[in-house]
Amino acid sequence: MSNTYGTIFRITTFGESHGNAVGVIVDGCPPNIEIDEAFIQSEMARRKPGQSKIVTQRQEDDEIEILSGVFEGKSTGTPIAMMVRNADQRSKDYSHIADRFRPSHADYTYQEKYGFRDYRGGGRSSARETLARVAAGALAKMILAKVNIKIQAYVSQVGPLKLTTDYKALNIPNAETNIIRCPDDAVAAKMIEFIDETRKNKDTIGGVVSCVIEGVPVGLGEPVFDKLHAELGKAMLSINAVKGFEYGSGFEGVEQFGSQHNDKFYADEQGNVRTQTNNSGGIQGGISNGEDIYFRVAFKPVATIMIDQESINDKGETVTVSGKGRHDPCVVPRAVPIVEAMAAIVMVDFYLRNKAIRLD
């Protein structure tokens, strides 16, 4: 099982949904970085369950404990271990699926691969694991802030409801003022109503999280196999429920001619090389070109629904699976900080890797 990500800035997550704790060990964090524990906790609060009527009602404080690697408020350069203790497990809600495979869950594949599985809340395959990524991502954001790299994500689609406004015309921080995390209040209200109706119908719905990375210097990315967009895609696709990733013009770019799609270069008043358009999404040849990096991440509907479904058990017999427990009717409101965290982890790793190969 692969539980570690990164080359220089490396994270290893541990823990299960209904185990004692979930946590992360971060190796490669530079020394003498001021560690703002309040900021880490605020990032955890953005992801935690029970924060509104349109997310799971599992009640967890998700209070982070820093176990090592920090002294007098600064990183020491040694591994930083952080942990959150689980408090509101209701494992009995899952006893009915101990021998049954839930449709579109990881139950069957984990059972077949490992010959054994923790069925309580999905065990290691649960999205609760992502709290560890958010904690590590908060550290990454602190480092990136020192070099003026800023990452912001927001909900741009829920089911058929789309926010079509270009990100440059949006006040992205406004996304944090509503429970869906969409920066357009009018669209947000429609999304919230749609999710609430879906929940009342005992069903779930998917959505899209858009992300913008500003202030990226030219040169981040390691061709040919560790291209910047390839690693961003890998990081996003490792998040639970993600079914798609596109950056820049994405799939819409196939409808353009090369004469339309090419980003023409020019020199600005300071002599910096810029592009007139940004269909490349800030990345060319797998290397950042100094423009904004922007991408979109598609999340499927949550697999656990409160409607009876036909499935099979571990004996191959046809059974009925009914959803129990507490689950999100739509993951995207809580996925926003997870997308930001994984983007931050990727970007800080590439920043440090770039520093390692240049002497100037």
From Swiss-Prot:
It is an enzyme of class 4 (lyase). Signal peptide: none annotated. Pathway: Metabolic intermediate biosynthesis; chorismate biosynthesis; chorismate from D-erythrose 4-phosphate and phosphoenolpyruvate: step 7/7. Its cofactor is FMNH2. Keywords: Amino-acid biosynthesis, Aromatic amino acid biosynthesis, FAD, Flavoprotein, FMN, Lyase, NADP. CDD domains: Chorismate_synthase (cd07304). Homotetramer. Belongs to the chorismate synthase family. This is Chorismate synthase. It comes from Cytophaga hutchinsonii (strain ATCC 33406 / DSM 1761 / CIP 103989 / NBRC 15051 / NCIMB 9469 / D465).
